[in-house]
Amino acid sequence: MSHALRAVFLDHASLDLGDLDMRPLHAAFDELQLHAASQPQEVAARLHGARVAISNKAPIDAQCIAARPELELILVSATGTNNIDLAAARERGIVVANCHGYGTPSVAQHTLALLLALATRLPDYQQAVRGGRWQQSSQFCLLDFPIVELEGKTLGLLGHGELGGAVARLAEAFGMRVLLGQLPGRPARADRLPLGELLPRVDALTLHCPLTEDTRGMLGAAELALMKPGAFLVNTARGGLVDEQALADALRGGHLGGAATDVLSVEPPRNGNPLLAPDIPRLIVTPHNAWGSREARQRIVGQLAENAEAWKAGRALRVVNAG
C-alpha cells in the first residue's frame, strides 16, 4: 500500500460553490480527489486507495468501513456525524473529526432575520405590494397585517450553547427579555425553566439544540397549545424537534402568530412535507441554508485542514469518536 496521503471528498458541492479558497485543504494531502456528490452505493468504490475520507452527508457505514482497510481518517465537513458509523470506525482505529462553531454568526443572523420577518409580516407585505394592493390603497400606507414590535417582548431559547448564546445577545440588542428552557433528558438547572413553564411565558421561541431520542418531537400538539396565542416559533436546529403536522395545524387554526423553519425532518423533502402545503398561513420555510454564508463555508475549509494537519502530527483536534 502506498503511503501517499490520498484523500477523497465525497460531496464537496455541498460546501464549495466555486467561491471558496480550497488551497488549505489541498495542501494538507498529497492528493485530493473531489466528487460533487456521492450516492450511498458509490461511496466504498470511490474511497478505494484513500487513507482519508471527507464527507458532509455522504454515508460511511460499517460495511463501507470494512471494505476499505486503508482508511485511517474521516473528516466531516459539518457538526453532525449521523452519516458516519462511529462505533465501526472506532473499532477499526479510524479517527473521525468534525467541524463546529463555523456557522454561529450566520445561523444567528438567519434566526433573527426569520423572527423579524414574522414580526413585521414581511412576506405578506411583499406579496401584497407585488399584487397591487398598496397601489390601490386609499391611504399612503398599507397596514393590512398586524406588525409586532420585539422591544419588551420575551424570547424563549431551547438550547443555550454557542449558537443559542449568540441569538440571545442579538435578541437583547432588540430589547427583548430572554428566558432559557430545560431540554428533555438533561439534568435540571436552576437557570432553566421546564418546558411547561417556559412556553406560556414567551412571545417567541427559538430552537438551538441537537436532535436526540430525548428531544425528537419535543414540540408536539400539546406543547404548541401551551404557547401564548400569537407567539412565534423559529427553528434553525433540526426538523425532527417539532411535530410538523401539529405545527401546520396550529398555524391553520390561528393559535400561533407565525412560524419559520430552516429545517425539515427529511431533507431534501422529495416526497413532500406537511409544512410545504400551500394553504398554511404565516409560515416561512428556508432550505437549510442558515449556515451557508461564504464566510461560514470558508471556516469549514480551514477546520478540515486544521483537523488533517493535527492528525498528521499525532494530535487530536475536534475528534468525535475518541475512547
What name fits each language-model region?
Residues 36, 77-78, 94-105, 182, ...:
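Short beta->alpha connector loops at strand-helix junctions that form conserved
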Residues 60-66, 177-179, 183-274:
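Rossmann-like adenosine-cofactor binding region
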